[in-house]
């Protein structure tokens, strides 16, 4: 089983799709990585040689601009923490668990707010 950046890639999938299982790598970036490494994108993960896996890992680690897995998760968490600390609008919305990109919250936003909290009716 190929292991890249601490992630086990699914054996039966094409390497181009398998690379997208790494946090921070999408379809476009996966194809660019394979092009740089000189690996055929149609190769199945189980058919990769150790040399090809090493080439792919080297290409991923060589680019300091594009973070993957733990480093990227840490940077995103630090950005959110900074927003909360400075007390800006987005930070306050993050703190309250509400959407911070301008969506309406009167009816929707259930993903952020969680399940409905029903209020009992008063009897007359």
From Swiss-Prot:
Keyword Transcription regulation: no
Annotated disulfide bonds: none
Pfam families: Ribosomal_S13 (PF00416)
InterPro entries: Rbsml_uS13_C, Ribosomal_uS13, Ribosomal_uS13-like_H2TH, Ribosomal_uS13_bac-type, Ribosomal_uS13_CS
UniProt biased composition (Basic residues): 113-124
Organism domain of life: Bacteria
GO cellular component: cytosol; small ribosomal subunit
GO biological process: one example: translation
A GO molecular-function descriptor: tRNA binding
This protein's UniProt keywords: Ribonucleoprotein, Ribosomal protein, RNA-binding, rRNA-binding, tRNA-binding
Annotated region (Disordered), positions in chain: 99-124
Role summary: Located at the top of the head of the 30S subunit, it contacts several helices of the 16S rRNA. In the 70S ribosome it contacts the 23S rRNA (bridge B1a) and protein L5 of the 50S subunit (bridge B1b), connecting the 2 subunits; these bridges are implicated in subunit movement. Contacts the tRNAs in the A and P-sites.
Homology family: Belongs to the universal ribosomal protein uS13 family.
PANTHER family reported for this sequence: 30S RIBOSOMAL PROTEIN S13/40S RIBOSOMAL PROTEIN S18, SMALL RIBOSOMAL SUBUNIT PROTEIN US13M
Quaternary state and interactors: Part of the 30S ribosomal subunit. Forms a loose heterodimer with protein S19. Forms two bridges to the 50S subunit in the 70S ribosome.
Protein name: Small ribosomal subunit protein uS13
Species annotation: Lachnospira eligens (strain ATCC 27750 / DSM 3376 / VPI C15-48 / C15-B4) (Eubacterium eligens)
């Amino acid at each position: 089983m190929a292991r890249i950046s601490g992630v086990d890639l699914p054996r039966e999938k094409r390497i181009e799709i398998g690379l997208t299982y790494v946090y921070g790598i999408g379809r476009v970036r996966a194809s660019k990585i394979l092009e740089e490494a000189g690996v055929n994108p149609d190769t199945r993960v189980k058919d990769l040689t150790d040399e090809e896996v090493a080439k792919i890992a080297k290409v991923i680690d060589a680019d300091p601009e594009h973070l993957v897995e733990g480093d990227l998760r840490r940077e995103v968490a630090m950005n959110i923490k900074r927003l909360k600390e400075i007390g800006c609008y987005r930070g306050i919305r993050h703190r309250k668990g509400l959407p911070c990109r301008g969506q309406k919250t009167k009816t929707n936003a259930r993903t952020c707010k969680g399940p409905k909290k029903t209020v009992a009716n008063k009897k007359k």
